[in-house]
Curated annotation (Swiss-Prot):
The enzyme's E.C. designation: 3.6.-.-
Xref: NCBIfam families: mnmE_trmE_thdF, PRK05291.1-3, small_GTP
Gene expressing this chain: mnmE
Zinc among keywords: no
Protein's organism: Legionella pneumophila subsp. pneumophila (strain Philadelphia 1 / ATCC 33152 / DSM 7513)
Protein name (database record): tRNA modification GTPase MnmE
Annotated positions binding Mg(2+): 229, 250
Length: 446
Protein backbone atom coordinates (compact mmCIF):
# COMPACT_ATOMS: atom_id res chain seq x y z
CA UNK A 1 0.00 0.00 0.00
CA UNK A 2 1.37 3.44 -0.95
CA UNK A 3 2.17 5.96 1.78
CA UNK A 4 1.55 9.03 -0.38
CA UNK A 5 -1.62 10.31 -2.03
CA UNK A 6 -1.77 11.16 -5.74
CA UNK A 7 -4.05 13.39 -7.79
CA UNK A 8 -4.61 13.93 -11.51
CA UNK A 9 -7.20 15.02 -14.05
CA UNK A 10 -8.82 11.87 -15.46
CA UNK A 11 -10.59 13.44 -18.45
CA UNK A 12 -8.98 14.54 -21.75
CA UNK A 13 -7.44 18.02 -22.02
CA UNK A 14 -9.74 20.82 -23.16
CA UNK A 15 -13.18 22.15 -22.33
CA UNK A 16 -16.19 19.93 -21.74
CA UNK A 17 -19.43 19.55 -19.85
CA UNK A 18 -17.79 17.51 -17.10
CA UNK A 19 -14.22 17.19 -15.92
CA UNK A 20 -13.02 14.54 -13.46
CA UNK A 21 -10.27 14.85 -10.86
CA UNK A 22 -9.12 11.56 -9.33
CA UNK A 23 -7.39 11.22 -5.96
CA UNK A 24 -5.97 7.97 -4.54
CA UNK A 25 -4.08 7.15 -1.37
CA UNK A 26 -4.33 7.12 2.42
CA UNK A 27 -5.21 10.83 2.65
CA UNK A 28 -7.73 10.90 -0.20
CA UNK A 29 -10.76 11.21 2.10
CA UNK A 30 -9.17 13.95 4.21
CA UNK A 31 -8.29 15.91 1.07
CA UNK A 32 -11.88 15.57 -0.16
CA UNK A 33 -13.11 17.06 3.13
CA UNK A 34 -10.75 20.01 2.64
CA UNK A 35 -12.24 20.59 -0.80
CA UNK A 36 -15.94 20.17 0.06
CA UNK A 37 -16.07 22.09 3.34
CA UNK A 38 -15.99 18.99 5.60
CA UNK A 39 -19.17 17.51 4.18
CA UNK A 40 -19.26 13.80 5.12
CA UNK A 41 -19.13 11.28 2.28
CA UNK A 42 -20.63 7.80 2.18
CA UNK A 43 -18.72 5.07 0.34
CA UNK A 44 -19.96 4.32 -3.18
CA UNK A 45 -22.46 7.19 -3.17
CA UNK A 46 -22.36 10.40 -5.21
CA UNK A 47 -22.66 13.50 -3.03
CA UNK A 48 -23.45 16.93 -4.45
CA UNK A 49 -21.05 19.46 -2.91
CA UNK A 50 -19.72 22.95 -3.21
CA UNK A 51 -15.98 22.89 -3.84
CA UNK A 52 -13.82 25.44 -2.05
CA UNK A 53 -10.45 27.08 -2.29
CA UNK A 54 -8.25 27.26 0.80
CA UNK A 55 -9.71 30.65 1.69
CA UNK A 56 -13.25 29.16 1.74
CA UNK A 57 -14.13 30.81 -1.57
CA UNK A 58 -16.40 28.59 -3.68
CA UNK A 59 -14.67 27.65 -6.94
CA UNK A 60 -17.29 25.22 -8.34
CA UNK A 61 -20.08 22.78 -7.52
CA UNK A 62 -20.15 19.12 -8.49
CA UNK A 63 -20.45 15.48 -7.48
CA UNK A 64 -17.93 13.81 -5.19
CA UNK A 65 -17.69 10.00 -5.11
CA UNK A 66 -15.88 8.09 -2.37
CA UNK A 67 -14.57 4.55 -2.90
CA UNK A 68 -13.14 3.15 0.32
CA UNK A 69 -10.19 0.82 -0.10
CA UNK A 70 -9.72 -1.98 -0.82
CA UNK A 71 -13.02 -1.82 -2.72
CA UNK A 72 -11.77 0.60 -5.36
CA UNK A 73 -9.89 0.54 -8.67
CA UNK A 74 -6.49 1.10 -7.05
CA UNK A 75 -7.24 -0.86 -3.89
CA UNK A 76 -6.75 2.36 -1.89
CA UNK A 77 -9.15 5.07 -0.77
CA UNK A 78 -10.21 6.83 -3.97
CA UNK A 79 -12.04 10.12 -4.48
CA UNK A 80 -13.48 11.17 -7.84
CA UNK A 81 -14.65 14.75 -8.23
CA UNK A 82 -16.97 15.46 -11.15
CA UNK A 83 -16.82 19.20 -11.71
CA UNK A 84 -17.52 21.41 -14.71
CA UNK A 85 -15.07 20.69 -17.51
CA UNK A 86 -13.22 24.00 -17.42
CA UNK A 87 -9.42 23.64 -17.57
CA UNK A 88 -9.15 26.54 -15.11
CA UNK A 89 -11.49 24.90 -12.58
CA UNK A 90 -9.77 21.53 -12.87
CA UNK A 91 -6.32 23.08 -12.46
CA UNK A 92 -7.54 24.89 -9.33
CA UNK A 93 -8.84 21.60 -7.90
CA UNK A 94 -5.45 20.01 -8.58
CA UNK A 95 -3.64 22.90 -6.86
CA UNK A 96 -5.94 22.74 -3.83
CA UNK A 97 -5.47 18.96 -3.59
CA UNK A 98 -1.69 19.36 -3.68
CA UNK A 99 -1.90 22.08 -1.03
CA UNK A 100 -3.89 19.63 1.13
CA UNK A 101 -1.17 16.98 0.90
CA UNK A 102 -1.43 15.18 -2.43
CA UNK A 103 1.18 15.07 -5.19
CA UNK A 104 0.66 15.03 -8.94
CA UNK A 105 0.40 11.47 -10.26
CA UNK A 106 2.83 10.07 -12.80
CA UNK A 107 1.42 8.78 -16.12
CA UNK A 108 -0.26 5.44 -15.44
CA UNK A 109 0.28 5.58 -11.69
CA UNK A 110 -3.36 4.83 -10.81
CA UNK A 111 -3.23 1.65 -12.93
CA UNK A 112 0.20 0.84 -11.50
CA UNK A 113 -1.19 0.99 -7.98
CA UNK A 114 -4.10 -1.24 -9.02
CA UNK A 115 -1.53 -3.75 -10.30
CA UNK A 116 0.70 -3.53 -7.23
CA UNK A 117 -2.34 -3.99 -4.97
CA UNK A 118 -3.44 -7.11 -6.90
CA UNK A 119 -6.61 -5.52 -8.27
CA UNK A 120 -5.54 -6.29 -11.85
CA UNK A 121 -2.68 -8.19 -13.45
CA UNK A 122 -0.23 -6.77 -15.99
CA UNK A 123 -2.23 -7.93 -19.02
CA UNK A 124 -5.32 -6.15 -17.69
CA UNK A 125 -3.30 -3.01 -16.93
CA UNK A 126 -2.03 -2.92 -20.50
CA UNK A 127 -5.56 -3.53 -21.76
CA UNK A 128 -6.71 -0.28 -20.13
CA UNK A 129 -4.27 1.69 -22.28
CA UNK A 130 -5.14 -0.40 -25.34
CA UNK A 131 -8.87 0.22 -24.86
CA UNK A 132 -8.27 3.97 -24.69
CA UNK A 133 -6.11 3.89 -27.83
CA UNK A 134 -8.21 1.39 -29.83
CA UNK A 135 -8.41 2.32 -33.53
CA UNK A 136 -11.52 0.28 -34.41
CA UNK A 137 -14.67 -1.26 -32.91
CA UNK A 138 -13.09 -4.71 -33.02
CA UNK A 139 -9.90 -3.54 -31.32
CA UNK A 140 -11.97 -1.92 -28.56
CA UNK A 141 -13.98 -5.13 -28.02
CA UNK A 142 -10.83 -7.25 -27.94
CA UNK A 143 -9.15 -4.86 -25.49
CA UNK A 144 -12.21 -5.15 -23.24
CA UNK A 145 -11.90 -8.96 -23.36
CA UNK A 146 -8.30 -8.66 -22.18
CA UNK A 147 -9.37 -6.21 -19.47
CA UNK A 148 -12.05 -8.68 -18.34
CA UNK A 149 -9.37 -11.35 -17.98
CA UNK A 150 -9.83 -13.59 -21.05
CA UNK A 151 -6.13 -13.57 -21.97
CA UNK A 152 -5.02 -13.83 -18.34
CA UNK A 153 -7.21 -16.91 -17.79
CA UNK A 154 -5.57 -18.70 -20.70
CA UNK A 155 -2.09 -17.95 -19.36
CA UNK A 156 -3.08 -18.95 -15.82
CA UNK A 157 -4.56 -22.26 -17.02
CA UNK A 158 -1.37 -22.96 -18.95
CA UNK A 159 0.66 -22.20 -15.83
CA UNK A 160 -1.47 -24.56 -13.74
CA UNK A 161 -0.77 -27.40 -16.17
CA UNK A 162 2.92 -26.51 -16.14
CA UNK A 163 3.01 -26.49 -12.33
CA UNK A 164 1.43 -29.95 -12.26
CA UNK A 165 4.02 -31.24 -14.73
CA UNK A 166 6.84 -29.69 -12.71
CA UNK A 167 5.57 -31.42 -9.57
CA UNK A 168 5.40 -34.73 -11.43
CA UNK A 169 8.94 -34.42 -12.81
CA UNK A 170 10.48 -33.21 -9.56
CA UNK A 171 8.78 -36.04 -7.65
CA UNK A 172 10.34 -38.51 -10.07
CA UNK A 173 13.75 -36.94 -9.42
CA UNK A 174 13.33 -36.81 -5.63
CA UNK A 175 12.09 -40.43 -5.31
CA UNK A 176 14.23 -42.46 -7.74
CA UNK A 177 13.73 -45.63 -5.67
CA UNK A 178 10.09 -45.94 -6.76
CA UNK A 179 9.36 -49.01 -8.87
CA UNK A 180 7.64 -46.96 -11.58
CA UNK A 181 10.00 -44.90 -13.76
CA UNK A 182 7.92 -41.74 -13.94
CA UNK A 183 10.18 -40.09 -16.54
CA UNK A 184 9.89 -43.01 -18.95
CA UNK A 185 6.30 -44.14 -18.45
CA UNK A 186 5.07 -41.85 -21.25
CA UNK A 187 2.92 -39.66 -19.02
CA UNK A 188 5.46 -36.84 -18.76
CA UNK A 189 5.97 -36.81 -22.51
CA UNK A 190 2.20 -36.67 -23.14
CA UNK A 191 1.67 -33.88 -20.62
CA UNK A 192 4.55 -31.89 -22.07
CA UNK A 193 3.27 -32.25 -25.63
CA UNK A 194 -0.21 -31.19 -24.52
CA UNK A 195 1.20 -28.03 -22.90
CA UNK A 196 3.23 -27.20 -26.03
CA UNK A 197 0.11 -27.60 -28.17
CA UNK A 198 -1.94 -25.36 -25.89
CA UNK A 199 0.82 -22.75 -25.87
CA UNK A 200 0.88 -22.75 -29.69
CA UNK A 201 -2.89 -22.15 -29.76
CA UNK A 202 -2.59 -19.21 -27.36
CA UNK A 203 0.31 -17.82 -29.38
CA UNK A 204 -1.77 -17.96 -32.56
CA UNK A 205 -4.62 -16.09 -30.86
CA UNK A 206 -2.22 -13.55 -29.38
CA UNK A 207 -0.75 -12.89 -32.82
CA UNK A 208 -4.21 -11.93 -34.08
CA UNK A 209 -4.48 -9.55 -31.13
CA UNK A 210 -1.13 -7.95 -31.96
CA UNK A 211 -2.27 -7.38 -35.56
CA UNK A 212 -5.41 -5.63 -34.30
CA UNK A 213 -3.49 -3.50 -31.82
CA UNK A 214 -0.35 -2.55 -33.72
CA UNK A 215 -1.33 -3.11 -37.34
CA UNK A 216 1.01 -3.75 -40.25
CA UNK A 217 3.72 -1.78 -41.94
CA UNK A 218 2.99 -2.32 -45.65
CA UNK A 219 5.71 -0.97 -47.96
CA UNK A 220 4.99 -0.45 -51.66
CA UNK A 221 8.06 -0.94 -53.86
CA UNK A 222 8.78 -1.20 -57.56
CA UNK A 223 10.46 0.38 -60.55
CA UNK A 224 9.64 4.00 -61.47
CA UNK A 225 6.25 4.50 -63.12
CA UNK A 226 4.96 1.05 -62.14
CA UNK A 227 1.88 2.63 -60.53
CA UNK A 228 2.88 2.63 -56.86
CA UNK A 229 1.48 6.08 -56.08
CA UNK A 230 -1.76 5.32 -57.91
CA UNK A 231 -2.09 2.19 -55.77
CA UNK A 232 -1.62 4.02 -52.46
CA UNK A 233 -4.18 6.63 -53.58
CA UNK A 234 -6.68 3.88 -54.36
CA UNK A 235 -6.06 2.06 -51.08
CA UNK A 236 -6.43 5.33 -49.15
CA UNK A 237 -9.55 6.35 -51.04
CA UNK A 238 -8.12 9.81 -51.70
CA UNK A 239 -5.20 11.53 -53.45
CA UNK A 240 -2.28 11.40 -51.04
CA UNK A 241 0.50 11.03 -53.62
CA UNK A 242 1.25 12.97 -56.79
CA UNK A 243 0.70 10.88 -59.93
CA UNK A 244 2.22 11.81 -63.31
CA UNK A 245 3.48 10.01 -66.40
CA UNK A 246 7.00 11.13 -65.54
CA UNK A 247 9.09 8.29 -64.11
CA UNK A 248 10.59 9.09 -60.73
CA UNK A 249 7.91 11.54 -59.56
CA UNK A 250 8.00 10.13 -56.02
CA UNK A 251 11.29 11.10 -54.38
CA UNK A 252 10.51 10.85 -50.68
CA UNK A 253 8.61 8.50 -48.38
CA UNK A 254 4.81 8.89 -48.40
CA UNK A 255 2.79 7.48 -45.47
CA UNK A 256 -0.91 6.80 -45.13
CA UNK A 257 -2.92 5.01 -42.42
CA UNK A 258 -6.10 3.06 -43.17
CA UNK A 259 -8.11 0.23 -41.64
CA UNK A 260 -8.22 -3.10 -43.46
CA UNK A 261 -11.05 -5.08 -41.84
CA UNK A 262 -10.15 -3.46 -38.49
CA UNK A 263 -6.39 -4.03 -38.97
CA UNK A 264 -4.50 -0.71 -38.83
CA UNK A 265 -2.55 -0.64 -42.08
CA UNK A 266 0.45 1.70 -42.21
CA UNK A 267 1.06 2.07 -45.96
CA UNK A 268 4.39 3.47 -47.12
CA UNK A 269 4.92 4.56 -50.73
CA UNK A 270 8.57 4.69 -51.79
CA UNK A 271 10.70 6.08 -54.59
CA UNK A 272 11.07 3.89 -57.66
CA UNK A 273 14.02 1.52 -57.29
CA UNK A 274 16.62 2.04 -60.01
CA UNK A 275 20.19 3.26 -60.53
CA UNK A 276 20.26 7.05 -60.55
CA UNK A 277 22.81 9.88 -60.61
CA UNK A 278 20.29 12.38 -59.25
CA UNK A 279 21.30 13.16 -55.65
CA UNK A 280 17.73 13.75 -54.46
CA UNK A 281 16.44 10.57 -56.10
CA UNK A 282 19.38 8.56 -54.72
CA UNK A 283 18.49 9.71 -51.20
CA UNK A 284 14.86 8.72 -51.80
CA UNK A 285 15.95 5.26 -52.98
CA UNK A 286 18.20 4.88 -49.92
CA UNK A 287 15.25 5.67 -47.65
CA UNK A 288 13.08 3.26 -49.60
CA UNK A 289 15.45 0.38 -48.81
CA UNK A 290 15.50 1.39 -45.14
CA UNK A 291 11.69 1.18 -45.01
CA UNK A 292 11.68 -2.14 -46.87
CA UNK A 293 13.96 -3.71 -44.27
CA UNK A 294 11.55 -2.66 -41.49
CA UNK A 295 8.38 -3.78 -43.28
CA UNK A 296 5.90 -6.38 -42.08
CA UNK A 297 4.88 -7.00 -45.70
CA UNK A 298 6.09 -5.74 -49.11
CA UNK A 299 3.99 -5.07 -52.19
CA UNK A 300 6.20 -5.35 -55.28
CA UNK A 301 4.32 -3.42 -57.97
CA UNK A 302 5.14 -4.48 -61.54
CA UNK A 303 3.91 -2.91 -64.78
CA UNK A 304 2.28 -5.88 -66.50
CA UNK A 305 3.43 -4.46 -69.83
CA UNK A 306 7.05 -4.75 -68.66
CA UNK A 307 7.13 -8.09 -66.82
CA UNK A 308 10.92 -8.32 -67.05
CA UNK A 309 10.98 -5.76 -64.22
CA UNK A 310 9.71 -8.44 -61.88
CA UNK A 311 12.48 -11.04 -61.91
CA UNK A 312 15.50 -8.81 -61.29
CA UNK A 313 13.83 -6.70 -58.60
CA UNK A 314 12.20 -9.68 -56.85
CA UNK A 315 15.57 -11.43 -56.67
CA UNK A 316 17.16 -8.27 -55.30
CA UNK A 317 14.46 -7.97 -52.63
CA UNK A 318 14.83 -11.62 -51.61
CA UNK A 319 18.60 -11.29 -51.32
CA UNK A 320 18.42 -8.04 -49.34
CA UNK A 321 15.41 -8.41 -47.05
CA UNK A 322 15.04 -10.80 -44.08
CA UNK A 323 13.33 -14.06 -45.01
CA UNK A 324 10.50 -13.39 -42.57
CA UNK A 325 9.20 -10.43 -44.62
CA UNK A 326 6.57 -11.70 -47.09
CA UNK A 327 6.56 -10.25 -50.62
CA UNK A 328 3.35 -9.96 -52.65
CA UNK A 329 3.88 -9.37 -56.37
CA UNK A 330 1.26 -6.98 -57.76
CA UNK A 331 0.91 -7.00 -61.56
CA UNK A 332 -0.56 -3.57 -62.25
CA UNK A 333 -2.25 -1.91 -65.25
CA UNK A 334 -4.42 -4.86 -66.34
CA UNK A 335 -6.78 -2.20 -67.70
CA UNK A 336 -4.32 -1.83 -70.60
CA UNK A 337 -4.62 -5.56 -71.41
CA UNK A 338 -7.35 -8.14 -71.87
CA UNK A 339 -6.62 -9.68 -68.47
CA UNK A 340 -9.05 -9.63 -65.55
CA UNK A 341 -8.35 -9.34 -61.85
CA UNK A 342 -7.18 -12.53 -60.15
CA UNK A 343 -4.93 -13.65 -57.34
CA UNK A 344 -3.16 -16.58 -55.78
CA UNK A 345 -1.08 -17.03 -52.63
CA UNK A 346 1.52 -14.29 -53.29
CA UNK A 347 0.43 -12.74 -56.59
CA UNK A 348 -2.31 -10.29 -57.55
CA UNK A 349 -3.38 -8.95 -60.96
CA UNK A 350 -5.12 -5.58 -60.71
CA UNK A 351 -5.57 -2.09 -62.02
CA UNK A 352 -4.60 0.60 -59.53
CA UNK A 353 -6.17 3.13 -61.89
CA UNK A 354 -9.68 1.62 -62.03
CA UNK A 355 -9.63 -0.23 -58.70
CA UNK A 356 -10.31 -3.61 -60.32
CA UNK A 357 -8.63 -6.31 -58.24
CA UNK A 358 -8.32 -4.18 -55.10
CA UNK A 359 -10.52 -6.57 -53.10
CA UNK A 360 -8.33 -9.47 -54.21
CA UNK A 361 -5.24 -7.58 -53.00
CA UNK A 362 -6.78 -6.97 -49.57
CA UNK A 363 -7.68 -10.66 -49.34
CA UNK A 364 -4.11 -11.74 -50.15
CA UNK A 365 -2.62 -9.26 -47.65
CA UNK A 366 -4.75 -10.74 -44.84
CA UNK A 367 -3.83 -14.29 -45.86
CA UNK A 368 -0.10 -13.58 -46.08
CA UNK A 369 0.10 -11.94 -42.65
CA UNK A 370 -2.06 -14.68 -41.11
CA UNK A 371 -5.09 -12.65 -40.03
CA UNK A 372 -7.96 -14.98 -39.14
CA UNK A 373 -10.51 -13.34 -36.84
CA UNK A 374 -12.01 -15.85 -34.41
CA UNK A 375 -14.45 -15.91 -31.52
CA UNK A 376 -12.88 -15.32 -28.14
CA UNK A 377 -10.14 -13.16 -29.62
CA UNK A 378 -8.28 -10.77 -27.31
CA UNK A 379 -5.82 -7.92 -27.74
CA UNK A 380 -2.12 -8.62 -27.14
CA UNK A 381 1.30 -7.00 -27.44
CA UNK A 382 4.59 -7.98 -29.01
CA UNK A 383 6.14 -8.60 -25.59
CA UNK A 384 3.49 -11.27 -25.04
CA UNK A 385 4.47 -12.99 -28.31
CA UNK A 386 8.15 -12.83 -27.36
CA UNK A 387 7.46 -14.41 -23.97
CA UNK A 388 5.32 -17.16 -25.53
CA UNK A 389 8.03 -17.88 -28.11
CA UNK A 390 10.68 -18.03 -25.40
CA UNK A 391 8.56 -20.36 -23.27
CA UNK A 392 7.94 -22.65 -26.24
CA UNK A 393 11.67 -22.80 -27.03
CA UNK A 394 12.38 -23.80 -23.41
CA UNK A 395 9.69 -26.49 -23.49
CA UNK A 396 11.06 -27.90 -26.74
CA UNK A 397 14.55 -27.97 -25.22
CA UNK A 398 13.15 -29.79 -22.20
CA UNK A 399 11.35 -32.22 -24.49
CA UNK A 400 14.67 -32.96 -26.20
CA UNK A 401 16.37 -33.49 -22.83
CA UNK A 402 13.68 -36.01 -21.91
CA UNK A 403 13.53 -37.84 -25.24
CA UNK A 404 17.21 -38.00 -26.11
CA UNK A 405 19.01 -37.96 -22.77
CA UNK A 406 16.46 -38.94 -20.09
CA UNK A 407 17.85 -35.95 -18.19
CA UNK A 408 15.21 -35.26 -15.56
CA UNK A 409 17.15 -32.48 -13.81
CA UNK A 410 17.67 -30.56 -17.06
CA UNK A 411 14.01 -31.01 -17.99
CA UNK A 412 12.96 -29.69 -14.58
CA UNK A 413 15.11 -26.58 -15.05
CA UNK A 414 13.67 -25.88 -18.51
CA UNK A 415 10.15 -26.26 -17.11
CA UNK A 416 10.98 -23.84 -14.30
CA UNK A 417 12.32 -21.23 -16.72
CA UNK A 418 9.32 -21.65 -19.03
CA UNK A 419 6.98 -21.18 -16.06
CA UNK A 420 8.83 -18.02 -15.01
CA UNK A 421 8.67 -16.65 -18.57
CA UNK A 422 4.90 -17.17 -18.74
CA UNK A 423 4.49 -15.48 -15.36
CA UNK A 424 6.19 -12.39 -16.80
CA UNK A 425 3.21 -11.98 -19.13
CA UNK A 426 0.76 -11.46 -16.26
CA UNK A 427 3.32 -9.66 -14.11
CA UNK A 428 3.75 -12.31 -11.42
CA UNK A 429 7.50 -12.21 -12.12
CA UNK A 430 8.42 -8.91 -13.76
CA UNK A 431 11.38 -6.54 -13.59
CA UNK A 432 10.90 -2.99 -12.33
CA UNK A 433 12.31 -1.68 -15.63
CA UNK A 434 9.53 -3.38 -17.60
CA UNK A 435 6.86 -2.07 -15.24
CA UNK A 436 8.21 1.45 -15.56
CA UNK A 437 8.22 1.22 -19.36
CA UNK A 438 4.64 -0.09 -19.50
CA UNK A 439 2.99 2.33 -17.07
CA UNK A 440 4.89 5.41 -18.31
CA UNK A 441 3.10 5.03 -21.66
CA UNK A 442 -0.32 5.52 -19.99
CA UNK A 443 -2.34 8.72 -19.80
CA UNK A 444 -2.00 10.82 -16.66
CA UNK A 445 -5.06 10.07 -14.53
CA UNK A 446 -5.14 6.38 -15.50
Amino acid sequence: MSIDTIVAIATPPGRGGVGIVRISGPNAYAIALCLNGNKALQPRLATFCSLYKGNNEVLDQGLVLYFKGPHSFTGEDVIEIQAHGSPVVLDLLIKESIAAGARLARPGEFSERAFLNDKIDLIQAEAIADLIQASSDTAARMALKSLQGDFSKKINQLNEELIYLRMYVEAAIDFPEEEIDFLNDGNVSQLLQKIIGRLEDIRSQANQGVLLREGLSLVIAGRPNAGKSTLINNLAGRDVAIVTEIAGTTRDIMREHILLDDIPLHIIDTAGLRDSDDLVEKEGIKRAWQELKRADCVLLVVDINNPDQQNSLLNELRLTLPNKIPIITVYNKIDTTKLTAKCDEHTVYLSAKTGEGLDELKKVIKQVVGYQPTEGQFLARRRHLQALDEAKALLLTGQSQLTNHKAGELLAEDLRLAHQTLCEITGEFTSDDLLGKIFSSFCIGK
